[in-house]
Amino acid sequence: MDNIISLILAILIIIICIGLGRKVLSFFGWLPSRELEIYILSFLFGHSLICYIIFFIGVSAGYTKSIIWSVLFFLLIASFFILKTGFLYRLIDFLIESFKNFIKIKNNSYILLLLSISIIIVSIMNFVAAFAPPTDADSLSYHLAIPKYFIDFEKIIFQPFYMSWGIPLHSEMFNLLGLILGYEIFPQIINWLMGIISAITLYILTSEIFSKRAGFFAAVFYYLTPKIIFLSSTSKSDLTLFSYIFLSMFYMIVWSSKKENKTLWLSAVFTGLALATKYQGFHWGLSIGLFLIILNFKDLKQLSIKTIKIPLVYGLISFLIASPWYIKNFILTGDPIWPFGFSIFNSQYW
């Protein structure tokens, strides 16, 4: 029974994410032209907004089941008002139409048919595996354990006995959501969905550079790798990180060809979300920053205010998006990247 409730809760949360994300995209004028992008961006923006809401509850009001249920109820009502114009009906129509087009495509190639069957079977198996109790060491030691400590203390705290207490836990806020409501399988259902979304974001990236068929092959081979299959039934944050990285690169490439600032700022937002998800996001932040400098190199030689402003604004947006977790670390330990900055910040507990 708990598994069924977890699934229903996941569906409701997905609706909330899409509704909130759609509103954010509309507010900033970031709605893309392709429907697939709209749905993916809406979910990821809504997902991130909920993660930050849960974070700020933990540093202010405190974690109680009544507060979380009240917030979710309010967000669900708000989402239905946002989506009342038929957005969900359009989503269903889009899925049906995509399936029809998918059937037409796969009948033209035995290879596409084989890959299509493979990804469907694997996704179903991953979905079933997501309902098993968590056994992964990292999930049990901090992806689920640290949010459980937050729940026990009813706020975001710091304990110095384990290095992972200092890492950004943006994605783990959804783990906390499931745990505090009493549905331990919920985080794994959401992470299963993140596996599919990360494959779709790779498709969006690859199809923009090459072709739709190339994007399909890239997404399928990515999703069928053993690592992604393993991650799809855990509570880890890697799949969320991959989604942010793929979209950050995608919008950077779009900006390089069209020079539309909104696509560059979208790239910056997803870079910031990558930084808020794991310390490994720094690897991506440095890489995409170097990529931006290379793309802008000809303009940088002119040293105009505009060419200098672009990298600075990009970095500022990324920093602001990721900053809550690093500010939290600085307040609690004196080291924003605890424990790795101890030699610079002379931080505590190390």
Where are these regions (language model features)?
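Perimembrane helix-loop-helix junctions
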Residues: 101, 284-318, 326
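Membrane-embedded, hydrophobic transmembrane alpha-helices
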Residues: 1-103
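Transmembrane-helix motifs of polytopic, lipid-linked glycan transferases
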Residues: 22, 48-51, 76-83, 186-209, ...
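Transmembrane-embedded, aromatic-rich helix segments that form part
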Residues: 218, 265-269, 280-295
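Membrane-interface transmembrane helices that cradle and orient dolichyl/undecaprenyl
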Residues: 248-264, 298
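Short helix- or helix-capping micro-motifs
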Residues: 218-223, 250, 271, 275
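Short acidic/glycine- and proline-prone juxtamembrane loop motifs at membrane-interface regions
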Residues: 230-240
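Transmembrane-helix signature of polytopic, membrane-embedded enzymes
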Residues: 32-41, 185-186, 200-226, 257, ...
